[in-house]
Amino acid sequence: MATPLFHGSIVALVTPMTHGEVNYEELKRLVEHHVQAGTHGIVSVGTTGESTTLSIDENVKVIKKTVEFADGRIPIIAGTGSNATSEAIILTKLLTNSGVAGCLSVVPYYNKPTQEGMYLHYKAIAESTDLPQILYNVPSRTGSDLKPETIGRLAEIPNIVGVKEATGDLTRLPLIKKLAGEDFIFLSGDDATGLESMKLGGQGVISVTNNVAAADMAKMCELALAGKFDEAEAINQRLMALHHDLFIEANPIPVKWAAYKLGLISEPNLRLPLTTLSEAAQPTVLAALQKAGLI
């Protein structure tokens, strides 16, 4: 099978802020950092990019600026999810001709739709655009699980091309591949099990760890996709503390603090109701950065 457009180490990029406002100069530097590090793709304004506390106008501007800064050197995936189908469609339409390579759309959160509701939600979004759509299943945050059987149904829609699975349940991968087809893209949304998912036929990871270990994550994924799992595992083990400890508090709280400690962004701040990493958690994240050899 040919290498799909969406593969390897795709960073779920933080949105840098100064005094509560998006810092576009720092965003430009972050995009350049990932291009130079070999990152295979950028998710702009996903969960890690604080999508829920940006306005629609800010969402669109950040994504369009990310496309501008990337300048065709790396595919940009737009976070366009919402728990209101109509809002997700508005976001998707606003970005259809923006230069993004595709959209990542989270399972509707809080309102807990049925499997049929999720199917109709994604079907309506896909029919509103020609852009490739990636489903995003993260039941620990949404309260709802997009079942493999529903993913299989959605895979029949031509521009629904893949799924980001953030359950960490590796038993789902072969079932999804069976129901959705071998060409359906499976991207792990769980750094700790990302390499294992690639051993089972997954194509990559949409990664939080990549924010602070971009070159290592890119190399690990390249080795894994080449079948060099022992070499990939050596990198993975060095990063394992990060994979876990960047979730010691709700994402993206720890990763923004870690990026700040590495000098990648000038402030670790987030918009309320998210707050900066607690003093009690900081030594744990610092130790993980040290174990990874990043400081």
UniProtKB/Swiss-Prot annotation:
Subunit (UniProt): Homotetramer; dimer of dimers.
Sample GO molecular function, one term: 4-hydroxy-tetrahydrodipicolinate synthase activity
Active-site residues, record numbering mapped to chain: Y136 (proton donor/acceptor), K164 (schiff-base intermediate with substrate)
Protein name: 4-hydroxy-tetrahydrodipicolinate synthase
Organism encoding this protein: Actinobacillus pleuropneumoniae serotype 7 (strain AP76)
EC nos: 4.3.3.7
Site positions for Part of a proton relay during catalysis: T47, Y110
Any single GO CC term annotated in Swiss-Prot or TrEMBL for this entry: cytosol
InterPro entries cross-referenced by the UniProt entry: Aldolase_TIM (IPR013785), DapA (IPR005263), DapA-like (IPR002220), Schiff_base-form_aldolases_AS (IPR020625), Schiff_base-form_aldolases_CS (IPR020624)
